Amino acid sequence: MEYTGSQYIGEFVDGRMEGDAEYILPTETKYIGEMKDGMFHGQGTLYFPNGSRFDAVWEKGLVVKGTYTFSDGLQYDTENWHYCDSYDRRFYTEICYGLKPAGISQLTNMDPPRKIPPGCYDCGDGFYNPNTRIVKDYNYRFLRNADDDEHEWIVRTCRKGWDETMGPEPKS
């Protein structure tokens, strides 16, 4: 653990993590649940720094069945996911608390939305800089390097930290 920056609170059997345990990763993601032979095995939950969680049944480190719950309480549904799509474009907070009056738009599930640093994108779990291809969390700590697919998705889909003129140029 000293080499990975992780922390383990629990028992060992034959030098391997085993039994009920708490495993904290360097990203501050925390696993609380059962371990066997050094792997997630049985019932366990991953708690993410942004407040979301993943409750799952694990077998030899792999998910058998699981449920992801966002920090606001919305549960991801793999079968009928219609959140913020062409079918229903409301954010979860709008579903729970109602729509704002005409003329006042809600840009994100968080209202008011986070201020995005210049040149960056808000990709849902942090800010993405397309020049460095690095995603940092909202406290500006390193999360990950984006691969080509994630870069393309973020640039195509996510909110920008700048305004763009759409349609015809306004007259001066």
Swiss-Prot record:
Repeat (MORN) residue spans along the chain: 8-30, 31-53, 54-75
Localisation per UniProt entry: Cell projection, Cilium, Flagellum
Database matches in SUPFAM superfamilies: Histone H3 K4-specific methyltransferase SET7/9 N-terminal domain (SSF82185)
GO cellular component term, pick one: sperm flagellum
Pfam family, one: MORN
Highest taxon of the lineage: Eukaryota
SMART domains per UniProt: MORN
Keyword vocabulary terms for this entry: Cell projection, Cilium, Flagellum, Repeat
Keyword Repeat: yes
Protein name from the UniProt record: MORN repeat-containing protein 5
Classification lineage: Eukaryota, Metazoa, Chordata, Craniata, Vertebrata
